[in-house]
Amino acid sequence: MASNVFSEIILFVSVLIITAAVSGILATSTHKISLGLEQRGDALSSQLTKDFEIINDPGYVLKNATDTTMIYLKNTGKSPITFDKEVISVLVDGNPVEISNTYVEGDSSVRVLGSSKVGKLHITYNTSGYHRFKVVTSEGIARTFTGEIV
């Protein structure tokens, strides 16, 4: 009789240990999933609040006397965008081009494009005709524009 009691106690304790281990694993997994969702939500929120548009006239993309082409961007998001030639990339017809300078309209010394502000990119590209421009920010936000350099 006593051996049955000990067997049942051992089985009961074993079940308790297994149950505790399984619940610990489930709690840890749930916590990791929760953290992952929170991080992805923060990243998506950051991308949604940082947005811009290329506002050039498609029929008249300006080229100045030093053969640099000007691309105008407007920050249409709620958060400022880093506006520096080191963190912005420009592709013309799929090929990367050098940005010679960046300017924020109204204050050329600022390197942050605030909400609703307009910035100007000077790119070293001077071939006339229709071209496809793609601007990519450091946050990975990209906009494409087709226009004629005159």
Curated annotation (Swiss-Prot):
Primary localization class, coarse: membrane
Gene Ontology molecular function: structural molecule activity
Bilayer disposition of the protein: Single-pass membrane protein
Spans traversing the lipid bilayer: 9-29
Record GO biological process: archaeal or bacterial-type flagellum-dependent cell motility
GO CC annotation, single: plasma membrane
Location relative to the cell: Cell membrane; Archaeal flagellum
One Pfam family per UniProt: Arch_flagellin
InterPro entries reported in the protein's UniProt record: Flagellin_arc (IPR002774)
Keywords (A to Z) from UniProt: Archaeal flagellum, Cell membrane, Membrane, Transmembrane, Transmembrane helix
UniProt family annotation: Belongs to the archaeal FlaG family.
Record's protein name: Putative flagella-related protein G
